[in-house]
């Protein structure tokens, strides 16, 4: 703001000089001394006005500083009152926290006493549970010994198992052979894929070479365009340089103007130095006031530091309380762990009891199946064909086939139910923390058992005259010639007609004429034959 006023004053001086010059021109009678006196008067008059303006401005600043000093004093007094109130509040809160800490210590002592009492009670319960577990363990060991003695009677079942294992080995050999064929097939496929990859790589290299040649052609065509662009850029640079030179000339002119203004400012600086000395004296007084304020601020900082120390003490007390609470929580977690261990032990005892009952049921079922199978085998072995007439051999074969089918159904149901139960029990017994290798072994064994069951289920009963050594062909029923049927009996003619319509042998209607024998129940749905006893088969539980 000050330089603008001075520029106005310079303009006024120039106008006054012009007026004086005009007066000189108009009044030629006045002497030059009177003109100089008038000019000095005007100059001093303007200087006095300038100084009066400055004095008014400094007076306003002094009033503003006085108002600010009053405000600072009021704020300082308010801060002192706030400090007193804060100290009183902190003292009250500290007393409250001390009371709370004493209450918490009392509660902690009571909790420790209760914890010790609960610990003693749980230890007594643990001892009782261990005693009960030992008793149940002894009972289970005795029962296992009794079951081991009973298992010695299953030697005949072991022989049948050996026969099944031999069949299983034959199937495994067949499976290995098929695996070898599959590996050869995979090798051929991999070889073919490698050859295809080489062919594709060669094609890609050829395409890359073609693209490179095309790129070179395009690059040669673009060289002319780049030179034209460089010429245009040079023209633009020359134009910019001309503009910069013009701007330099303008800056030199402005520099000369600034030098003229600098001389004027030097004159004003001399005038301001006097005022600076006056302001320095005032600043000394202000510095004394500032020192007083700094001492008061230091006192306030000391008060705040004391308050922070009190806060730190409170924080430490809160940390101690938190550590005590954490110790209490750890004790509770230990108690919960002991409870969980008790539950797990009880669950394991129940599981062992359930497994024992399942094993007993399975063994009873196997015994019943074995007794039924032995009775069926005895009946089959005791059957004897009557050799009086050739027609009775058909009935004997039908009866024998029925009994063999019943025996096969009985044994297959037992074989299917037993592995399913074993698999279910094995899945229940598997712990959650098994390694990956053991899980893979268990999965492979399950898959092998499932494949064996599927193979057993696909086995079909043999038809009479078909032992299964030769693969079956499509049955094409060719009607017999009447010339071939003439020498045959009535019974054989009816049997051939039935065979043309069905794949299995059913009793013909002509057999009902004979009164010397009776067919079995599944074919005639009448009374049981006197020669062959059909055993009652009990249902096998799943």
UniProtKB/Swiss-Prot annotation:
Transmembrane segments: none
Phosphothreonine modified-residue sites: 31
Coiled-coil residues: 33-192, 250-370
Quaternary structure note: Interacts with TUBB and TUBA4A. Interacts with CEP350.
Biased composition (Basic and acidic residues): 10-27
Function statement: Specifically required during spermatogenesis for flagellum morphogenesis and sperm motility. May be required to suppress the formation of supernumerary axonemes and ensure a correct ultrastructure.
Keyword field: Cell projection, Cilium, Coiled coil, Cytoplasm, Cytoskeleton, Differentiation, Phosphoprotein, Spermatogenesis
Similarity comment text for this entry: Belongs to the CFAP157 family.
Gene: Cfap157
Any one GO biological process: sperm axoneme assembly
GO molecular function, one term: microtubule binding
Broad class of where this protein is predominantly found: cytoplasm
Protein name: Cilia- and flagella-associated protein 157
Organism: Rattus norvegicus
Region (Disordered): 1-32
Compartments in which it is found: Cytoplasm, Cytoskeleton, Cilium basal body
GO cellular component, one term: cytoplasm
């Amino acid at each position: 703001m000050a330089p603008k006023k001075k520029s106005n004053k310079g303009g006024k001086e120039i106008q006054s000089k012009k007026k004086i010059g005009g007066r000189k021109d108009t009044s030629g009678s006045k002497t030059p001394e009177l003109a100089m006196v008038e000019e000095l008067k005007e100059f001093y008059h303007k200087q006095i006005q300038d100084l009066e303006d400055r004095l008014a401005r400094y007076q306003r600043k002094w009033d503003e500083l006085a108002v600010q000093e009053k405000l600072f004093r009021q704020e300082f007094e308010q801060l002192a009152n706030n400090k007193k109130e804060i100290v009183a509040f902190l003292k009250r809160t500290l007393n409250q926290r001390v009371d709370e800490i004493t209450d918490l210590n009392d509660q902690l002592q009571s909790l420790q006493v209760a914890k010790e009492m609960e610990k003693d009670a749980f230890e007594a319960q643990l001892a009782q549970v261990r005693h009960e577990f030992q008793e149940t363990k002894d009972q289970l060991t005795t029962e296992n010994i009794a079951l081991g003695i009973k298992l010695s009677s299953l030697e005949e079942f072991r022989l049948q198992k050996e026969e099944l294992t031999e069949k299983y080995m034959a199937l495994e050999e067949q499976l290995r052979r098929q695996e070898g064929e599959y590996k050869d097939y995979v090798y051929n496929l991999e070889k073919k894929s490698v050859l295809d990859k080489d062919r594709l790589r060669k094609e890609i290299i050829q395409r890359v070479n073609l693209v490179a040649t095309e790129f070179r052609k395009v690059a040669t065509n673009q060289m002319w365009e780049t030179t034209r662009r460089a010429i245009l850029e040079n023209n633009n640079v020359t134009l910019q340089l001309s503009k910069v030179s013009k701007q330099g000339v303008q800056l030199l002119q402005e520099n000369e103007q600034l030098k003229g203004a600098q001389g004027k400012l030097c004159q004003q600086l001399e005038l301001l130095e006097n005022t600076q000395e006056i302001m320095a004296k005032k600043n000394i007084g202000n510095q004394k006031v500032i020192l007083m304020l700094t001492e008061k601020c230091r006192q306030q900082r000391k008060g705040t530091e004391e308050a922070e120390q009190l806060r730190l003490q409170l924080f430490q007390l809160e940390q101690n309380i938190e550590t005590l609470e954490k110790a209490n929580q750890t004790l509770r977690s230990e108690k919960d762990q002991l409870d969980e261990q008790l539950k797990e032990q009880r669950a394991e005892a129940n599981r062992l009891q359930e497994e024992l009952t399942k094993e007993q049921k399975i063994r009873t079922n196997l015994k019943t199946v074995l007794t039924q199978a032995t009775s069926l085998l005895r009946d089959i072995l005791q059957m004897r064909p009557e050799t009086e007439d050739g027609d009775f051999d058909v009935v004997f074969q039908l009866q024998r086939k029925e009994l063999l089918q019943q025996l096969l159904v009985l044994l297959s149901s037992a074989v299917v139910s037993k592995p399913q139960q074993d698999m279910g029990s094995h899945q229940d017994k598997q712990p959650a923390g098994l390694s990956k290798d053991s899980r893979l072994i268990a999965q492979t064994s399950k898959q092998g058992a499932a494949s064996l069951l599927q193979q057993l289920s696909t086995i079909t009963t043999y038809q009479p005259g078909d032992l299964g050594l030769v693969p079956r062909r499509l049955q094409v029923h060719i009607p017999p010639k009447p010339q071939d049927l003439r020498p045959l009996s009535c019974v054989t003619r009816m049997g051939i007609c039935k065979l043309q319509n069905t794949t299995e042998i059913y009793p013909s209607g002509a057999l009902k004429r004979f009164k010397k024998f009776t067919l079995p129940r599944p074919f005639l749905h009448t009374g049981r034959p006197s020669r062959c006893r059909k055993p009652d088969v009990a249902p096998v539980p799943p």
